[in-house]
From Swiss-Prot:
The keyword Isomerase applies. GO terms for molecular function: glutamate-1-semialdehyde 2,1-aminomutase activity; pyridoxal phosphate binding; transaminase activity. Its main location: cytoplasm. It comes from Dichelobacter nodosus (strain VCS1703A). This is Glutamate-1-semialdehyde 2,1-aminomutase. It catalyses: (S)-4-amino-5-oxopentanoate = 5-aminolevulinate. Its cofactor is pyridoxal 5'-phosphate.
Amino acid sequence: MTDSAFTRAARVIPGGVNSPVRAFKSVGGEPIFIARAEGAYLYDVNGRRYIDYVGSYGPMINGHAHPEIVAAVCRASRNGMSYGAPNELETELAEKIVARVPSVEMVRMCNSGTEATMSAIRLARAATNRTQILKFAGCYHGHSDALLVSAGSGALTFGSPNSPGVPEDFVRHTLTAPYNDIAALERIFVQHGKNLAAVIVEPIAGNMNCVPPLPEFLPTLRALTKKYGVILIIDEVMTGFRVAYAGAQGLYDIAADLTTFGKVIGGGMPVGAFAGSADLMSMLSPVGSVYQAGTLSGNPVAMIAGITNLRLTEAEGFYDTLAAKTQKLAEGLRQAAKKNGIHVVVNDVCGMLGLFFTDLPQVCNFADVQTADTARFAKFFHAMLAEGVNLAPSAYETIFVSMAHDDAVLDETIAIAEYVFAHLEE
């Protein structure tokens, strides 16, 4: 008998995967192995097709293998994969980011969201000459030691938000607060505000599924950070250029001191960036003394993928169309569940959607998220997968909608969900 792709992988890769959430541990079973992707679809190694709502966890806002992105990457690769020297494409991508986000004057490219948030924290500590940072429970900002505390995403999925191997000396410098809890936030600033270097926040908490901010949460956070001289880092790795033309900062009219980017700015290639005012960013080496570097940072193939992905989002009506697609799917899921007597909460913001099996009327924070029935989600996940719809294999991950999800695909998805809800209790 031939080994499965997963069995083969597990011999040489820990857990058979290169990012833990892919392993299906929280939903059970073996992960599907993908051979190719196009538009709204994935195709596994056995040739089966799936409507995909993972979208590589966010970058594929224009769908998989968009012909313009593929063509641009092919052209760039013929000129060399990486130079270890400056190139004009990294300048062009930085210019696009600066043009779209008012709080950004300068950009430093790196290779992942983790690198971006890690570097932003270092820069904030240097700028303030303070050590402590504040993050929010259930928010995930990559797997660096300082930020792997009360973390969401894969850490939350595996029930180990504080990883072994992270020294207590690191953890004690990281404070946590409940997301969307203004009273708790104000108490923390009264007690610790003068010692905080930075607050880092997901403007939409997309790593404990999808939890948008309450109306006064981000404005209060901005006011408190200004009052106490704390650097506000808005982590837009997930939301940047997905939820609006200027990202979540544009959507919610909020301005960061430092912003982190990833996912959409790479178009499927490994790209991250951190950005901010010229004064702050000029503290970075080689101009200043705050060190940050990367062998493949700004490589031309990744840069052209990001440039092309962003250019496609500049089409007239792009974000209105994406928001309408997201709303259609969200309402379809609500009605499909309601028709079958199943209570769910569905949160949605342009291109992002969260489905929670909970009896609560709304989901606003990590504590609310934890009421969700993960076993029921696992059953729903496998039933949807069996019918040809691929969701992230965790109750704590966002559903991503792309421009490739046309009305026919969305209608098919809603019909499948209605069928699955009807048989979920069997």
